[in-house]
Design a protein with these regions (language model features):
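Conserved short beta-strand edge segments in small beta-sheet-based binding/regulatory domains
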Residues: 27-32, 55-75
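Short amphipathic alpha-helix segments
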Residues: 6-28
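Ser/Thr- (and often Asn-) enriched beta-sheet segments in non-cytosolic proteins
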Residues: 4-8, 36-39, 67-69, 76
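Short amphipathic alpha-helices in soluble, non-transmembrane regions
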Residues: 18-23, 48-59
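Short glycine-rich, basic-tinged beta-strand/loop micro-motifs
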Residues: 1-4, 30-45
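Serine/threonine-rich low-complexity intrinsically disordered regions
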Residues: 11, 25, 40-43, 69
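Short, low-order "capping/linker" segments at domain edges
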Residues: 41-53, 70-86
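Short, flexible coil/linker elements and helix-boundary hinge sites characteristic
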Residues: 1-3, 21-23, 62, 75
């Protein structure tokens, strides 16, 4: 069973950085000024690999925030007072 995974960021540029790190081909879109990536995960392990890719990209690129939504859950990454890009 496929699970829809939605990744949201502060901007399309931030979403493009994350899309490059995902283990599947993904494209970033802009929606109401936010960056959005939509992908389908085939398993819990693949969902976890998406979350790990977002986490790595978030830290490496010093993004302001990112949110991963899947099933009825979400994982939020925030800068919390650290200097950020952009």
């Amino acid at each position: 069973m496929s699970v829809r995974v939605t990744i949201e960021t502060a901007s399309k540029a931030d979403a493009e950085l994350i899309a490059q790190r995902l283990p599947v081909k993904a494209s970033a879109e802009s929606w109401r000024g936010f960056g959005v990536i939509r992908v389908a995960a085939r398993s819990r392990e693949e969902t976890n690999s998406f979350i790990e890719a977002v986490s790595r990209s978030f830290q490496e690129n010093k993004l302001r925030w990112a949110r991963v939504r899947y099933d009825d859950e979400e994982r939020v990454f925030k800068a919390n007072g650290h200097p950020t890009a952009g």
